[in-house]
């Protein structure tokens, strides 16, 4: 099986004050990479890691597009994409968000303001990921791991304990916040719809649409809470089903007193197979 992975982790942001920087995203990217090589047969050369200044929107989209092209040509049959960063919301760009009238987006290193919103040239919008992951061939298995969030509405006191920080950045102005604060985030289910001719991607997400993912301190270092417990669970049992994996990650989050609840969006058959296995 020819495998490739792209692991992205962004702690520092070129145009944001240090108060908005994160601590555990680079560790997340490196930990997912190490997991893939130690447990799932990836070679070091199979994995691209983009962190901080390397992870501009242009570089991440270029890397994803190249991997999609290689998958479409049949050169690879397994692709893992992990992303740890801030999430945010921007006004709906194309009118497809009938419910919440906002697009979910992921902050890249070069995130910058454009009026009352974040510049779409510096964030990756959920619609862009959906376009990338639509029309993939049936022979290509895609697993997406997102340790980020798109809503601040679920913040609780636990999210502000010492050593914890939410992975959410609101719009840059009060008017921008007003434009999306009544939105009802619906999550990223569109990412897994795929197409009739291809296999839908498998999506692991750090939390429910109305919750906040935590950047936290574990045993002397920082990680995303979701990534930390995901990696621990897969090290303990690499062959467990995806459904079982979700249960173990959720158990870990509860034990750590994190309010977020991990999510798995995948076809029914995929949930009964292990991470990295087709169905």
Label each region the model flagged.
Residues 1-279:
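Cysteine endopeptidase catalytic domains of the caspase/legumain-like
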């Amino acid at each position: 099986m020819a495998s490739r992975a792209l692991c992205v982790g962004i702690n520092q942001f070129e145009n944001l004050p240090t108060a908005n920087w994160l601590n555990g995203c680079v560790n997340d990217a490196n930990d997912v990479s190490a997991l893939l090589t130690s447990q799932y047969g990836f070679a070091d050369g199979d994995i691209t890691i983009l962190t901080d200044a390397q992870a501009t929107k242009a570089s991440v989209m270029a890397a994803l597009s190249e991997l999609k092209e290689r998958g479409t040509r049949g050169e690879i049959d397994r692709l893992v994409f992990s992303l740890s960063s801030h999430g945010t919301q921007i006004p709906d760009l194309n009118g497809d968000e009938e419910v919440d009238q906002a697009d979910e987006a992921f902050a890249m290193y070069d995130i910058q303001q454009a009026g009352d919103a974040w510049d779409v040239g510096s964030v990756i919008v959920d619609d862009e990921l959906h376009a990338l992951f639509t029309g993939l061939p049936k022979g290509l298995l895609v697993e997406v791991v997102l340790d980020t969030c798109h809503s601040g509405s679920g913040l609780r006191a636990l999210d502000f304990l010492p050593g914890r920080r939410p992975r959410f950045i609101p719009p840059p102005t009060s008017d921008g916040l007003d434009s999306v604060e009544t939105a009802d985030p619906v999550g990223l289910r569109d990412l897994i719809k795929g197409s009739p001719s291809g296999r839908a991607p498998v999506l692991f997400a750090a939390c429910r649409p109305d919750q906040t993912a935590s950047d936290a301190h574990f045993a002397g270092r920082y990680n995303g809470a979701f990534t930390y417990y995901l990696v621990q669970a897969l090290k303990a049992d690499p062959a467990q089903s995806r459904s079982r994996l979700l249960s173990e990650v959720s158990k870990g989050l509860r034990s750590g007193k994190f309010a977020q609840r991990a999510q798995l969006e995948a076809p029914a058959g995929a949930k009964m197979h292990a991470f990295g296995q087709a169905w």
